[in-house]
A protein has these predicted regions:
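Glycine-rich phosphate-binding loop of nucleotide-binding enzymes
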Residues: 138-242, 469, 498, 543, ...
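Conserved ATP-driven motor cores of ASCE-family P-loop NTPases powering translocation/secretion/packaging/pilus
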Residues: 230, 469-470, 474-560
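Switch/connector loops and helix/strand junctions flanking conserved nucleotide-binding motifs
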Residues: 64-67, 209-214, 250-256, 460-461, ...
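Short glycine-/polar-rich loops that comprise or flank the Walker A/P-loop
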Residues: 87, 159, 196-198, 238-241, ...
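Conserved beta-strand position immediately N-terminal to the Walker
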Residues: 162, 415, 487
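P-loop NTPase motor domains
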Residues: 188-198, 202-203, 207-211, 235-474, ...
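Basic- and hydrophobic-enriched, low-structure N-terminal and domain-boundary segments
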Residues: 1-167, 175, 187-197, 201, ...
C-alpha cells in the first residue's frame, strides 16, 4: 500500500461486518460525507490481501456514555458527565478485489479512495483503456471528481437507452439529457466508431428552452467553465444544430416558421399530401390509446394502404395528388392532369373529404375495399376522429415545395412542437420516430441515431396501445441492433410502459416526490438514496448503470448555451462568423 493514502477511520468492531455493508469509526480529525468512496484492505488466510471498496450511504454521530435524554446537556454544557463523541459512516460494498467475498476485518484502517483506487471503485478499469476506453465522464461527484458511464451500455454494444425521471421544473431532466449529448460529442474516442456521423433528434415540447443550443449563455460563469474543464470538455454551445418549427397556418405566410422566441436560423416544416401518403402518416392521426379498442386503427391501416394504391401526382402542382382506382386505365405513375370536377388534394382537409367519399358516401354504401366489413359505427367514429384532427393537425399538411425536416443537415436536429395542440405534437413525434425507424431497418447499427423525447408518458403510457407507443417499444427492444438510441424523460417512471423502462440500461433520476419515490420502478436505488431523492436540488442526479452495483449521485455543470432569449450573449454571437 502507498504511504500517501488518506486514512479516515477504522472498520467498526462493536458490531458484525458483512460482505454487503460495514461501518467506519472516523478519526477525530477526519470526516466522510455521503457518496464518498472508501477502500479497506484485509489479509485473508491462504488468499492474501483483499481490497473492499464501498460508497458511503449514511453518517451518524453519538455521545458514548450518554444514556438519558438529559445526559446530552450534562456532558456538553455542564461538564458533570463524561461522554465521548463518536462519528461513524455506513458503507455499502461496491467491489471486492480479488473477488474473494469476505467481510472486512474489524479494526482495519479505512482510506478515502482517490486516484486509481477511486477509478477501481467505479469500475473504470473495466471500461477499457487507451484507444479502446469506453469510460465517458457524465458529471462530477461531491468532491469535484469525474463520474463515468460505460458507453457500452448506451451505444448498443452491451445495452442501450437512457431513462430520466423527476419532478417537472426542478429535476432538470432535459438539461441533463442535453449535457449527456454534449459529453458524447465532446469525447468521440469514448464513443468510438459510433461517433462518426452521429445524428441526434430532439423534440422541444415545453417552452423555448431548446431553441438556443448554439448561442452562448451570458450568465455562464468561470466557475461553471472550470467544472466543464474538469470533465475534459471545452465549455461551448453545440456547434452543429438545425432548428425547425411548424409553418405558419396562413397561406400568405408560406415557408415562415411559427417561432416567436427565435426567428433567425429556424426553418419551417410541414408535409405535402404526397409525403403524407408515401410515409403512411394517417395512423398517427389516431394516437389516442383508446382508439385501438374500437377497431379504428384497423380502418386507419386499411385506408392507408388504399391511399398508397390510389394516389397519383398532379402535373404542375408539387406535392398535390388525386385519388384514382389503380385498376382503371386513367390511373398513372406519371403526373396527371385532373379531370373537370375531380378533387385535387392540396391539404389535409381535401384528403379527409376525399376519404369520406369512399368510406362514408352520402348516397351509397361504404366501399368495402376501404373499410372491410367493420360495423358502420366504427366507420363513423373513424371519420369523426379525422374531422376532429383537422383544426389541430391541418396546418402540417399542405401542397407545395417539400419542407420535410432534413436531419442530415446538422448533427443535432431540434424540432419545436411546444405551441402545437397535443394531437399535433403526437402526430409530429410519431411521424419523425417512424422515419428514423424506417431508415435504420436493415441498414446496420451505424451511423447511430439518438432520439431525445420529453414527456414520454404521453407517447408510451403504461396502459393502452397506439402506433407511436408500438414504434417506441420496438425501438426499446431492438434499438441495440438497429442503432437507434432513446433518451426518454418523464415525471413519473411508474406511468411509462414497462418494456421501455426495462430496456433502458442507464437510469437517471432527479428530485422525486415522496409517493413516486416508493414505486417499484425505483428499486435500483438504495433505501437511503430514495430518501435523499426527495431533497435533490436542480443539477443533482442519481445515476444507475449495469457496470456499478450501487447508484451514484452526481452534479452536472451549468450549460454554456442559452436556454431562453434573455440569456443569449449577443456580444459573443457574431452573425458574420465564417463569412
Amino acid at each position: 500500500m502507498l504511504d500517501d493514502r488518506r486514512e479516515v477511520g477504522l472498520v467498526l468492531g462493536s458490531e458484525a461486518t458483512s460482505t454487503q455493508e460495514f461501518r467506519v469509526l472516523l478519526h477525530d480529525d477526519e470526516y466522510l460525507q455521503v457518496d464518498d468512496l472508501v477502500v479497506s484492505y484485509t489479509d485473508v488466510p491462504k488468499a492474501g490481501e483483499v481490497a473492499t471498496y464501498g460508497i458511503v450511504t449514511e453518517t451518524a454521530t453519538v455521545l458514548e456514555g450518554a444514556s438519558l435524554e438529559g445526559d446530552t446537556r450534562r456532558a456538553t454544557v455542564e461538564g458533570t458527565l463524561y461522554a465521548e463523541k463518536s462519528r461513524t459512516a455506513t458503507v455499502q460494498t461496491v467491489r471486492v478485489l480479488p473477488e474473494t467475498w469476505v467481510a472486512p476485518d474489524s479494526g482495519q484502517p479505512v482510506y478515502k479512495a482517490t486516484g486509481a483506487e477511486r477509478e477501481r471503485a467505479l469500475y473504470v478499469d473495466e471500461m477499457g483503456g487507451g484507444e479502446s476506453a469506453r469510460a465517458l465522464p457524465v458529471g462530477l461527484s461531491r468532491d469535484d471528481e469525474p463520474v463515468w458511464v460505460d458507453v457500452d451500455f448506451f451505444d448498443g454494444t452491451k445495452g442501450a437507452h437512457m431513462s430520466i425521471s423527476g419532478v417537472s421544473g426542478v429535476a432538470t431532466k432535459t438539461s441533463y439529457a442535453l449535457f449527456f449529448l454534449r459529453c458524447l460529442t465532446a469525447h468521440p474516442k469514448s464513443l468510438g466508431k459510433g461517433a462518426r456521423n452521429l445524428k441526434v433528434l430532439v423534440f422541444n415540447v415545453k417552452g423555448q428552452d431548446l431553441l438556443f443550443l448554439d448561442k452562448p449563455n451570458a450568465r455562464f460563469t468561470e466557475d461553471a467553465a472550470d467544472a466543464w474543464r474538469k470533465l475534459g470538455m471545452d465549455p461551448a454551445p453545440f456547434d452543429s444544430v438545425s432548428f425547425w418549427a411548424p409553418a405558419l397556418a396562413h397561406g400568405a405566410s408560406e415557408g415562415v416558421p411559427d417561432s416567436r422566441a427565435r426567428t433567425e436560423g429556424v426553418e419551417a416544416f410541414r408535409w405535402t399530401p404526397r409525403e403524407f401518403v408515401d410515409e403512411r402518416l394517417l395512423p398517427f392521426l389516431f394516437t389516442d390509446t383508446g382508439d385501438s379498442r374500437q377497431q379504428i386503427t384497423f380502418v386507419a391501416e386499411r385506408v392507408t394502404r388504399q391511399l398508397e394504391r390510389f394516389a397519383c401526382d398532379v402535373a404542375g402542382r408539387e406535392g398535390a395528388i388525386v385519388l384514382r382506382d389503380p385498376n382503371d386505365a386513367i390511373h398513372s405513375d406519371e403526373p396527371v392532369v385532373p379531370f373537370p370536377g375531380e378533387r385535387v388534394i392540396e391539404s389535409l382537409g381535401d384528403l379527409v373529404e376525399e376519404i369520406a367519399s369512399y368510406v362514408e358516401p352520402d348516397d351509397a354504401e361504404p366501399d368495402p375495399s376501404w373499410t372491410s366489413r367493420v360495423a358502420p359505427g366504427t366507420v363513423s367514429a373513424f371519420m369523426r376522429r379525422l374531422y376532429g384532427a383537422l383544426p389541430r393537425v391541418g396546418r402540417l399538411v399542405k401542397a407545395g415545395p417539400s419542407r420535410r425536416i432534413d436531419r442530415a443537415r446538422e448533427a443535432v436536429t431540434v424540432v419545436d412542437i411546444h405551441d402545437l395542440h397535443e394531437a399535433a405534437q403526437r402526430f409530429v413525434v410519431g411521424a419523425m420516430i417512424a422515419e428514423v425507424h424506417g431508415e435504420k431497418e436493415g441498414r446496420g447499427r451505424f451511423p447511430l441515431s439518438v432520439i431525445v423525447l420529453d414527456e414520454l408518458n404521453k407517447y408510451a403510457p403504461r396502459d393502452g396501445w397506439s402506433p407511436i407507443k408500438d414504434t417506441l417499444i420496438d425501438i426499446a427492444q431492438r434499438g441495440r441492433s438497429l442503432g437507434i438510441l432513446l433518451i426518454g424523460a418523464q415525471q413519473s417512471a411508474s406511468r411509462i410502459d414497462p418494456d421501455i423502462l426495462g430496456n433502458a440500461s442507464i437510469k437517471v433520476s432527479g428530485r422525486l416526490d415522496s409517493a413516486e419515490a416508493e414505486r417499484s420502478e425505483y428499486g435500483w436505488m438504495l433505501p437511503s438514496t430514495r430518501a435523499r431523492a426527495r431533497l435533490l436540488k436542480p443539477g443533482t442526479m442519481v445515476l444507475s448503470q449495469p457496470s456499478i452495483p450501487a447508484p451514484t449521485v452526481l452534479e452536472f455543470p451549468y450549460p454554456p448555451w442559452a436556454t431562453r432569449p434573455e440569456e443569449v450573449d449577443e456580444a459573443a454571437s457574431d452573425p458574420f462568423e465564417g463569412l
